[in-house]
């Protein structure tokens, strides 16, 4: 048996009275739910990201072909599937009038009625239950947004943002406990994820509301970045047992920055409480008019714009900015690439991550080079200069490979933008 099939949306109020008179059906029931974007028949799966739906399956034969009618307990949705052995059977098939009169729509190629979408979002003609989705999004370790076109941009973006709250709080606590370079970098990354989403797709939120949170996060992250640089330099000098005249000044600057970041961390905890309140909005009160539009087509032009901004940044040779922008685009490709059902986004994200790593390495070398400016360490500074040159050359090769992927990604986004699915 091949996967050749036709699928039809039926008038469920009449279909079973007709079937009872004309066909002999075998009925089975099972629970349908989505686990890690794969269908599961379990009713009590802890990792499931939606409520279980009771699906009734009626099997029978029509013109000697196997047929299935799927009925769900949440609404009057009924789907007829007719299965074929080969293309000739499909081409010559014609529904008998008793069923043809009950067909509302041919949904063979309509992904909104695919089983995984039905399992996650219920009736494709639904009012999306955002509060229910939040319960799953905020507790999942790895939230992947694979959704049908019918979910709004406002709901989709907030699902991703709410899933980042728990890891953000955890990394914030880790920073306050350790205050070392590793914990600073981890906190920086999770903050950057939030900022990248809010800046890139901020047009779906009320501008004034969003700016309150975005302004604080940007200021906090700027200070945290400076602290990361000072911490890295101080730790490097201590490990390498290198003494420079300005070390005492450097350590004092680092200490002042650390105290400031700790104070602002407590403010961040309060800001996050308010942000969670906004993300739980169930009435589109904090949404812009754009937020009510469909998710995929709304995000596509915003995604493309972010790519163009990154490409412009590459030519600036400001390696710190290149690293930040590559990281931001990596976040977007990782979190939202699955929306567009193409493996190219994962490969694109991998290349962006490589560019970010190389750019950050150049920045570290430059931090050391600046710190030892004027010091009598000619051999060390010569080695640093060589490391910088090698890293720049390596980064240029990474950029060239990325350009080949950019056009492919933009073509995919263009399709969604133009057709509006």
Predicted regions and their residues:
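Phosphate-end processing signature that detects enzymes handling 5′-triphosphorylated RNA
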Residues: 1-421
């Amino acid at each position: 048996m091949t996967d050749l099939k036709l699928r039809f949306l039926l008038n469920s109020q009449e279909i079973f009275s007709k079937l009872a008179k004309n066909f002999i059906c075998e009925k089975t029931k099972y629970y349908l739910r989505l686990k890690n974007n794969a269908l599961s028949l379990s009713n009590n799966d802890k990792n499931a990201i939606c409520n279980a739906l009771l699906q009734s399956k009626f099997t029978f034969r029509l013109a000697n072909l196997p047929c299935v009618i799927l009925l769900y307990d949440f609404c009057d949705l009924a789907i007829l599937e007719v299965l074929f052995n080969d293309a000739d059977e499909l081409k010559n098939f014609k529904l008998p009038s008793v069923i043809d009169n009950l067909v509302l729509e041919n949904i063979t190629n309509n992904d909104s009625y695919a089983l995984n979408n039905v399992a996650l979002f219920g009736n494709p003609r639904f009012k999306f239950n955002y509060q229910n989705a939040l319960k799953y999004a905020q507790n999942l370790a790895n939230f992947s947004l694979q959704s049908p076109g019918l979910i709004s941009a406002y709901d989709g973006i907030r699902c991703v943002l709410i899933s980042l709250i728990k890891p953000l709080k955890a990394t914030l606590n880790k920073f306050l406990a350790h205050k070392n370079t590793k914990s600073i970098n981890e906190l920086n990354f999770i903050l950057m994820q939030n900022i990248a989403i809010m800046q890139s797709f901020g047009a779906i939120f009320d501008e004034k509301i969003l700016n309150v949170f975005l302004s604080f996060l940007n200021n906090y992250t700027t200070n945290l970045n400076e602290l990361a640089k000072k911490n890295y330099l101080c730790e490097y000098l201590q490990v390498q047992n290198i003494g420079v005249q300005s070390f005492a000044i450097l350590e004092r600057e680092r200490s002042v920055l650390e105290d400031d970041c700790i104070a602002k961390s407590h403010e961040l905890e309060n800001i996050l409480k308010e942000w969670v309140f906004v993300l739980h909005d169930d009435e589109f009160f904090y949404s812009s008019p754009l937020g009510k539009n469909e998710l995929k087509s709304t995000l596509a032009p915003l995604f493309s714009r972010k790519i163009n901004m990154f490409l412009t940044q590459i030519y600036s040779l400001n390696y710190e900015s290149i690293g930040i922008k590559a990281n931001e685009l990596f976040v977007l490709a990782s979190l939202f690439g699955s929306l567009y059902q193409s493996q190219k986004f994962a490969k694109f994200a991998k290349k962006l991550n490589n560019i970010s790593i190389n750019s950050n390495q150049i920045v570290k070398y430059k931090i050391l080079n600046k710190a030892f400016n004027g010091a009598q360490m000619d051999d060390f500074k010569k080695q640093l200069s060589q490391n910088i040159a090698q890293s720049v050359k390596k980064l240029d090769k990474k950029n060239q490979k990325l350009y080949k992927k950019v056009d492919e990604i933009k073509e995919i986004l263009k399709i969604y933008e133009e057709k509006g699915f």
